[in-house]
Amino acid sequence: TEGREVSTTMVFVRILAKLLKDKEIGKLVVPIVPDEARTFGMEALFRQVGIYSHAGQLYDPVDKDSLLYYKEAKDGQILEEGINEAGSMSSFIAAGTAYNTHGINMIPFFIYYSMFGMQRVGDLVWAAGDIGAKGFMLGGTAGRTTLNGEGLQHQDGHSHLLAYPVPNLVTYDPAFAYELAVIIRDGIKRMYEDQEHIFYYITLMNENYAMPEMPKGAEKGILKGMYKFHASDKKSLKLKAQLFGSGTILNEVIKAAKILEDDYRVACDVWSVTSYKEIRRDALEAERFNLLNPTAKQKESYIEKMLAKEDGVFVASSD
């Protein structure tokens, strides 16, 4: 972002706006919001594509005089469901299974307060997995450190744990804009080009910070679940630490690395961990192959390959 501070939620809304404008797939994108469209900065989409209403706009919204007013239309594209996560998840399932039911590859993006997803409609998430729904669930305002103003009810630090058991749910906790872009692009490829029966859960933050450029060769690691964001250049230091960070906490990990190097003479490599679930999934697959094929060449998991030559203390932090 060239020094400009934005949140990953803002980045997602920009990605969504561009997808909606795409001449090929724009008409297939289904934005679904239970209640918090303005909280997520999505009001620009009201004017761009409108909010779907089978009857059209039957009243004058209170913000009619503003540029980005609450615009309902018969041809609107946003599903604004009110405070109704269960109904929104049902819309997600309907759109996410349209490829099977109607032969149309709809691409739903269901964004909501992350505390009110897995914790509130977990059964429907399992149903989506069972029925083969595709699409993206976005847990907005995730984490426990950047939404203190709204109280403990919104401080979600555990939705990823609830997402772990769903086998075909691919989960990510990205820190930077380029990570989010890579994940969404690959998700569209896997679900709609490769026809994999998976769906996605991605947490988004509301903390604003400058987004760096993508390090060369990082794309594979982003999708696999981890990559080295910064390698220490303090080769002369005897002590070493490997610091893992996810989501917005990665910024604090980067700061911690500098403090450790400058004040305590501990060389620190910083790793961005985008998905512990994907790392674990890969490790379990390697372990299973090795167990069932004892005479074949044994597979090495991604995390084993990445950390084989790394030493020092390993510290993992997330929000």
Language model: regions and residue ranges:
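Flexible inter-domain linker/hinge segments
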Residues: 1-26, 212-221
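Accessory "access/gating" subregions that flank catalytic or transport cores
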Residues: 15-20, 25, 29-38, 44-61, ...
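Short coil/turn connectors at secondary-structure junctions
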Residues: 25-29, 73-76, 102-108, 131-136, ...
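Short beta-strand segments
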Residues: 33, 111, 138-141, 201-205, ...
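Thiamine diphosphate
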Residues: 41-162, 164, 171, 179-185, 244, 254, ...
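Ferredoxin-type iron-sulfur electron-transfer modules in oxidoreductases and energy-metabolism complexes
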Residues: 176
